[in-house]
């Protein structure tokens, strides 16, 4: 079974490039300090890597 990751948006997307905004939205994060739980898949890990400066990640 894949591990679960708890992803929290900790920095704003204001002033960020459109691709980073789209990645944050694709992760399901809409507001600051919003948290989602996702399965650890290569796609999700790539998205986290792209916006790692905006989010914090913990194992759920």
Curated annotation (Swiss-Prot):
InterPro entries listed in its UniProt record: Ribo_uL30_ferredoxin-like_sf, Ribosomal_uL30_bac-type, Ribosomal_uL30_ferredoxin-like
GO biological process entries: translation
Ribonucleoprotein as UniProt keyword: yes
Top-rank lineage group of the source organism: Bacteria
GO MF term (any one): structural constituent of ribosome
One GO CC term on file: cytosolic large ribosomal subunit
Keyword terms, alphabetized: Ribonucleoprotein, Ribosomal protein
Subunit organization: Part of the 50S ribosomal subunit.
Similarity comment text for this entry: Belongs to the universal ribosomal protein uL30 family.
Protein name listed in UniProt: Large ribosomal subunit protein uL30
């Amino acid at each position: 079974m894949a591990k679960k990751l708890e992803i929290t948006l900790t920095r704003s997307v204001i002033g960020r490039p459109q691709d980073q905004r789209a990645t944050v939205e694709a992760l399901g994060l809409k507001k600051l300090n919003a948290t989602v739980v996702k399965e650890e898949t290569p796609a999700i890990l790539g998205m986290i890597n792209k916006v790692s400066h905006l989010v914090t990640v913990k194992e759920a």
